[in-house]
């Protein structure tokens, strides 16, 4: 397959090195352009937790002149290639060629980021062929993420692929592999529970909303305080399709900034002061609060008044603050569902364990899917090999035919002799390769190969 992946992630390298190896902004497009000089297509995935180069390496042998300079390892690699060529061992030679390409990409990456190979090599991991395919699928499915099963990585890979397409760095063959990886990752997520449960506070809060309310466009979300945690929660809940959002905050500028983030043609956004909280509480179906205040902002009395005003329609209250913003006694009120940060953490802990259990099934499915993808790749590759074989055969036959036609135009041409000679040459030409292969198999005692070739030739004769 000649697919390789070279990279670092949160498991292999400290954040200080990951920062130095991260490719940001125009670096990705520049890197993709440079990689085209020694790869048959590449994709670069660079996030806060990983920098990875996925590349198809060429089949050609690297000469000493094409290896990067100033690398003692490159000189060693060249000598290994030469010894493999002498040994005439095709399997070892192919492996050595891939190793040489891997070394070149490593050396290039170090130079591109103005680091030495010795600095980064201990932290780099390398996978090749089906192992590279397995790694790519595990990454795309969220099985290699810091948060097991998280879905963002698939979107990040898709953006990386689009960047490669824009830079003309995605070859047809690599594009085919990418399509296979995306389809397989979708199956892993659909057929296992590895990403089904929320494992962050914001996702857990959003999950609660969908469990209690199903007509979200008609619901109102009240955001009490516009800090970072509440911003994440509000973003996730609003993204579910909530039709109206009210933001109460001491600092009007921060409230307006959050309002700008959440603004949507299908969503009403209102900014209020904290002093208006008792009045707007009655309008809220969902409340998310995280103020950092030392005092209770929503007590039992205020909640009872709000419920009465809304004719006791259910309310979901999410209190992410420590100390609490919402009095714990509110949980005793009928029609109010109150969840504290501890409640959500408990839910998350259970969900993480469920994801770990689901990951076992996901890993088994990944192994199965990689086998299927590799078989499809081999079938696809054999199709190309067959086409090339037929093209070469046609060229050889046509060459012999043209020579015979030229002889027919001679003054002393005997058509019968020319036709006999043509058939002899065609027979010799077409049987040379299988005859040579059978003799080689017999000499080496490879009875399995010998039986395969003989059986194939006999089938060919029966079919004609």
Curated annotation (Swiss-Prot):
Give the positions of the site Important for activity. Answer: 135
Q: What class of enzyme is it?
A: oxidoreductase
Q: Which GO terms describe its biological process?
A: protoporphyrinogen IX biosynthetic process from glutamate
What molecular functions are annotated in GO for this chain? glutamyl-tRNA reductase activity; NADP binding
Task: Quote the function comment for this protein.
Answer: Catalyzes the NADPH-dependent reduction of glutamyl-tRNA(Glu) to glutamate 1-semialdehyde (GSA).
Give the quaternary structure: Homodimer.
Return the NCBIfam families for the record: hemA (TIGR01035)
For this entry, the protein name equals: Glutamyl-tRNA reductase
What is the organism of origin for this protein?
Psychrobacter cryohalolentis (strain ATCC BAA-1226 / DSM 17306 / VKM B-2378 / K5)
